[in-house]
């Protein structure tokens, strides 16, 4: 059984065991009577067996999602706006005007083209000011990447820093500053506090009259830590100002939380490390256009009384299986399923194989040979934004989750 069909089967079985009217969205009308019969025959044995089966089913689902256990997010878990916007761009939701990503975010075509998983990491709040020259301000950030699975190959990584427009002043028109990003090769020596051995990863000269996020390539450092298993001593960020006094330094590049800033506000403006990786399963992230998918399915909706093989609606609601506490988006999705007769002779629109045509022909003269079956012939992926077991936000592409076409096979 292909992974997509396994996924649908397990979800349906979970709903049968859970029972109740609240789960009707996952059970087609034609199957409700059968569900009632199963529940009736189960009797007193249902409770214990159901819980045991549910555990097995959930374990199977979590394994398919690449998780070792059911995530239980803490109340302090934060979903970065960047990850929400990236999900909307990747899934095609940016076509809806009211959900346009903020800040003019552009979809990262190049890093996403080699990845099926995007992960975000906030620094460990272990912020160290690094003493430097009078015109510089430098900070060290430590990111814990231990939650990245061993089978996930990182292809690229970026550090995102938020900077605010500097108030106008005498040097406003010619005001520039340079942001340097370093990998810390060795931690501060005890004999020389604050002194770091670093290597430059990326640098940018920016004008201070714009409020925006800046993205820096830190792939060499993250690849050393994950692929080569080298020690992770963090990143150093240095901001060099050319036309400001020491009192104005670092105030517009958000590297640390101010005393007057609330925790909620700071959470959305903290430095963010984003990794792009691939676990070897399925295809890379690709932007999808929702409008095209909707138009594609309109012809099948008109044939409501047709009993022949076709696609039927099947909405999977993650709240029905108690997963809405860790799955951020989507709240559910239209999985669809295939059902119907494969009559003789098979017409071209049944999308049949030569073998199915021969099998149907033989069935017409010998009923002991079964008819061809109505099955999915085309499947597509969905993207999920969720919190993993370590409260890290993950955007992942899951293959073969949506039935796009049915046929007799």
Curated annotation (Swiss-Prot):
Keywords of the record: Chondrogenesis, Cleavage on pair of basic residues, Cytokine, Developmental protein, Differentiation, Disulfide bond, Extracellular matrix, Glycoprotein, Growth factor, Osteogenesis, Phosphoprotein, Secreted, Signal
Protein name: Bone morphogenetic protein 4
Pfam families: TGF_beta, TGFb_propeptide
GO biological process assignments: blood vessel endothelial cell proliferation involved in sprouting angiogenesis; chondrocyte differentiation; deltoid tuberosity development; endochondral ossification; glomerular capillary formation; heart induction; hematopoietic progenitor cell differentiation; kidney development
Source organism, top-level taxon: Eukaryota
Lipid metabolism found in the keyword field: no
Family note: Belongs to the TGF-beta family.
InterPro entries: BMP4_TGF_beta-like, Cystine-knot_cytokine, TGF-b_C, TGF-b_propeptide, TGF-beta-rel, TGFb_CS
Residues carrying Phosphoserine: 91
Propeptide, chain numbering: 20-293
Record-annotated disulphide pairs: 309-374, 338-406, 342-408
Signal peptide positions on this chain: 1-19
Any one GO molecular-function label of the UniProt entry: BMP receptor binding
Annotated stretches, region: Disordered: 91-110
Subunit structure: Homodimer; disulfide-linked. Interacts with GREM2. Part of a complex consisting of TWSG1 and CHRD. Interacts with the serine proteases, HTRA1 and HTRA3; the interaction with either inhibits BMP4-mediated signaling. The HTRA protease activity is required for this inhibition. Interacts with SOSTDC1. Interacts with FBN1 (via N-terminal domain) and FBN2. Interacts with type I receptor BMPR1A. Interacts with type II receptor BMPR2. Interacts with FSTL1; this interaction inhibits the activation of the BMP4/Smad1/5/8 signaling pathway. Interacts with SCUBE3. Interacts with TGFBR3.
Localization of this protein: Secreted, Extracellular space, Extracellular matrix
Glycosylation sites: 144, 209, 351, 366
Protein task: Growth factor of the TGF-beta superfamily that plays essential roles in many developmental processes, including neurogenesis, vascular development, angiogenesis and osteogenesis. Acts in concert with PTHLH/PTHRP to stimulate ductal outgrowth during embryonic mammary development and to inhibit hair follicle induction. Initiates the canonical BMP signaling cascade by associating with type I receptor BMPR1A and type II receptor BMPR2. Once all three components are bound together in a complex at the cell surface, BMPR2 phosphorylates and activates BMPR1A.
GO cellular component, one term: extracellular space
């Amino acid at each position: 059984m292909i992974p997509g069909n396994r996924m649908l089967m397990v979800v349906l079985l979970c709903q049968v065991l859970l029972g109740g009217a609240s789960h009707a969205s996952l059970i087609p009308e034609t199957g409700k009577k059968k569900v009632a019969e199963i529940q009736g025959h189960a009797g007193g044995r249902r409770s214990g067996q159901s819980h045991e089966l549910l555990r097995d089913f959930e374990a199977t689902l979590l394994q398919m999602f690449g998780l070792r256990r059911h995530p239980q997010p803490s109340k302090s878990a934060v979903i970065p706006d960047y990850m929400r916007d990236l999900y909307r761009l990747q899934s095609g939701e940016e076509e809806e005007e009211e959900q346009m990503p903020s800040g003019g975010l552009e979809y990262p075509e190049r890093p996403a083209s080699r990845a099926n998983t995007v992960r975000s990491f906030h620094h460990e709040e272990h912020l160290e000011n690094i003493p430097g020259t009078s015109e510089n301000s430098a900070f060290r950030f430590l990111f814990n990447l231990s939650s990245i699975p061993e089978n996930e190959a990182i292809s690229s990584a970026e550090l995102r820093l938020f900077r605010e427009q500097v108030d106008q002043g005498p040097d406003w028109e010619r005001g520039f500053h340079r942001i340097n990003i370093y990998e810390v090769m060795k931690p501060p020596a005890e004999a020389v506090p604050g002194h770091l051995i670093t290597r430059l990863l990326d640098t940018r000269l920016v004008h201070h009259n714009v409020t925006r996020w800046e993205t820096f390539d830190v792939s060499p450092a993250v690849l050393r830590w994950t692929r080569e298993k080298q020690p992770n001593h963090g990143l150093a960020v240095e901001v060099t100002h050319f036309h400001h006094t020491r009192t104005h330094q670092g105030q517009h590049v958000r590297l640390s939380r101010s005393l007057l800033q609330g925790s909620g506000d700071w959470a959305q403006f903290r430095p963010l490390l984003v990794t792009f990786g691939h676990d070897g399963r399925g295809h890379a992230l690709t932007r999808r256009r929702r409008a095209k998918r909707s138009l594609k399915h309109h012809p099948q909706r008109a044939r409501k009384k047709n009993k022949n093989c076709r696609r039927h609606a099947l909405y999977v609601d993650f709240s029905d299986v108690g997963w809405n506490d860790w799955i951020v988006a989507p709240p559910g999705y239209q999985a669809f399923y295939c059902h119907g007769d494969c009559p003789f002779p098979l017409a071209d629109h049944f999308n049949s194989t030569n073998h199915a045509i021969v099998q149907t022909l033989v069935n017409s003269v010998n009923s002991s040979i079964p008819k061809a079956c109505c099955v999915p012939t085309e499947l597509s992926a969905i993207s999920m934004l969720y919190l993993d077991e370590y409260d890290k936000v993950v955007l992942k592409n899951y293959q073969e989750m949506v039935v796009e076409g049915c046929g007799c096979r």
